[in-house]
Amino acid sequence: KPGPWVSTKVDSICSYCSMGCNLSYKIFYDHCFTVDNVNGDSHNKGYLCSKGRFGYRYMIDEKRLLKPMIKKRGQHVEATWDDAIKTVVDKVSSIVEKNGPDSVAIFASPRMTNEELYALQKFARVGIKTNNVGSFSNILNNIEYDCLDDMFGLTVSTTTMDELNNADVILVINADLSEENLIAELKIKAAQKSGAKIVTVNSSEIPLNKFSDLWVDPKRGTNTVLIQGISKYISDMGFEDNNFIGERTENYEVFKKSLP
């Protein structure tokens, strides 16, 4: 029988993905003992995905580096934080003095929080005076993010999760939400119970297909052709919302001419 473990509750934000779900850590001594959901007025409504609930184990992984390592004579040697910071300052200062600030680039880890990313870009732009700031996330996930910046001006969604509740039809294209964003999948299923129709476009048998009202299984690599065909049909039938298009988009006529 487990003992009555005394733990400290710490409410926090999950940093695994951009959802930023509210959660609660139960701390036992210096180790994370368990993770619970936070009920109440939070955007995730108490839902947590498996990564948010169980992914905390990486924080106490025995293989995790707890102290800085400096490479000397081809070997990584344990160092103090003061020595590590001084080494970074000396190396970066030497490079900037010799080649200028634009010779330095800062790359962020995909695991960093928004607050850490903000501090890192401040360090780059104010401290080093370079705008060469990037991330390894698109390299690791093989995702191209620039297209969102080009189309929407920001690498963010143009809607909110709560607006799914007001949707009549929800189209999920080439995404496995059970792996990529389980909270979004749970909210889509909840919207379906309120009357929304789910259409999935995916050439793989993802879990959401079992719940969708229509599963379109295109030939791999033809999603763009499918979307162009849908757009062409909407345009030919006059189903587009011209007021919305006029207020929020540019070069729509050019887009229409590009359709097959």
Which residue stretches match the model-derived regions?
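Catalytic alpha/large subunits of respiratory electron-transfer oxidoreductases
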Residues: 2-260
